């Protein structure tokens, strides 16, 4: 994949360095709702927030008139303009120092580190890398890099590599209720997760799309549940292709050495998302 030279047309470099600061309270109410959504026991005030549950906090509180047709916040402020492209959360990475603590305020400092246009097999793709630094009571907790891709409307990919042999495995069949509740608890208005006519007619998917962050959460916690005595150091993940409503999703992984694991999520058509977990030695 080679970078194109049409960045000047989009003025992409103007967004590099954009910064915003968001404060939120890691409130127990939302924590309980996420636990109910995922079907797990809820931690309590004063306890660590489970990894990746921070995605339900620090969300922009916008009026409906400030959302685009797809349900995302209108871009062109902090984020670059979409220019008729579909926006996707393609993957990311996190480096953990300490967890956020439930019941205390926290801050997320966000900076656009890079914006680049590349030419892929389906046409022009715009990749945006956003760095988030999370602090609580003046202490740095962890750093996240989020990878966003803007792509031209094209039919989604349906097949991928066969899943490797797993050391641990569980499965879930996401329901429309799960997708709706995860959208609600993360304040995610993206219509591909709950609006069937929109996702099929406008964006070309076969059915409602399972959230990439939800799958990353399932993949990471599948690994953590298999190794409860290990301490999480880092996690990176990448979407391979979409999963949709009704897919029987396998959440799997394998240790490659004492401190590293490969994790993935697959369905009958192959790998959907893959990631790497690193534990503290």
List the predicted regions and their residue ranges.
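Hydrophobic, proline/glycine-rich low-complexity stretches
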Residues: 1-105
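HotDog/MaoC-like acyl-thioester-processing domains
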Residues: 2-20, 89-174, 242-281
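Generic secondary-structure boundary/loop-capping signal
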Residues: 23, 52-55, 64, 75, ...
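Generic structural "secondary-structure junction" signal
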Residues: 57, 90, 96, 102, ...
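A contiguous, surface-exposed recognition patch within enzymatic or periplasmic domains that forms
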Residues: 5-48, 161-215, 222-225
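Short, surface-exposed helix-loop/turn micro-motifs enriched in polar/charged residues
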Residues: 44-47, 124, 231-232
